[in-house]
Amino acid sequence: MRVFLTGGSGFVGTAVIEELVARNHSVNALVNRHGLNAGGGAVREVKGSLFDPAALDEGMRGCDAVIHLVGIIMEKCSRGVTFERIHYRGTISVVDAARRNGVRRFVHMSALGARPDAVSEYHKTKYRAEQYLRGSSLEWTIIRPSLIHGPGGEFMRMEAMWARKRAPFPVGFMPFMPYFGAGKLGFGGAGKLQPVYVKDVARAFVDALDNRRTVGEVYLLGGPDQLTWPQLHRTVGQAVVGKRRWVMPIPVWAGKLYAAIGVAPLLGFNRDQVIMSQEDNTADITKFRQDFGWDPQPFEPALREYARQL
């Protein structure tokens, strides 16, 4: 099968390319500024952006399927990089190109928590993108992962940095591993996560391509472990530095204040992430297990596979 892929130079995209190539699929990967980190000569790079119809047409020509992965965690409004533009309008552009080029199979990356009444713009725009795809005539599958972990991902890079008592420049030093908690002092609790290994996410996307049971379906995807933020931090600390690190909450109100005054990026977060941290990002993945026929890996054993790379 020849597959057109967006987001191929990213964290998840790199893993998906490796999985596609390992299964002898041919790949046309849309590449903007950054080159690919996987695939070698087995992948054809197509220069362009989500909003370049000529590049999309060139990349999709002769393809049997599209895997659309592009997404952002933080906005850069001064550069026009917003959730609305990338998640929603970018998806419209790719879906329209698939229809225009007769590529009917479309596997789409969304996010666990995407819904019309979401508290964050991140999830709202993910849901709107889903709705546009669902209204098309394409043979679509939507996958909504929880937090994706693995080597090369920004989240685990930050986790490892905190485990080593470091923080992004110019802060430099972080004596504890932080999370956002409710209440005046932050000890009022926070949401749970269901981390899923990037290799399992890649496997799911490639499996979906020729699994007819998945057409017209939305899948929630997470690992078997539902963890609080302190549990996740301590597990990472143990794997990375050999001991459980000190974990401390930052009150939600303080996180929002830091975001408002521009300090948050120095600590590696934004306002939407503060808001989302208070919700459970967990799901029942029974439907995924039934239709895909396998279980995602637990967090700690998967983490130990790559902890030395962090």
Model region roles, listed by residue range:
Residues M161-V196, D200, A204-A208, R212-V215:
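A conserved pocket-lining segment of Rossmann-fold NAD(P)-dependent short-chain dehydrogenase/reductase
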Residues E84-T91, V107, K126, Q194:
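Short alpha-helix in the Rossmann-fold core of NAD(P)-dependent oxidoreductases
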Residues R2, A202-F269, A283-L310:
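Mid/C-terminal beta-alpha module of Rossmann-like enzyme folds, strongest
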Residues G35, G39, V43-S93, A97-R100, ...:
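NAD(P)H-binding glycine-rich loop region in Rossmannoid oxidoreductase-like domains
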Residues M1-H25:
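N-terminal Rossmann NAD(P)H-binding glycine-rich loop of SDR-like oxidoreductase domains
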Residues Q131-M161, V171, F176:
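Conserved beta-loop-beta element that borders a ligand/cofactor-binding pocket
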Residues E75, L112-Y122, I148-G153:
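Conserved catalytic-site region of short-chain dehydrogenase/reductase
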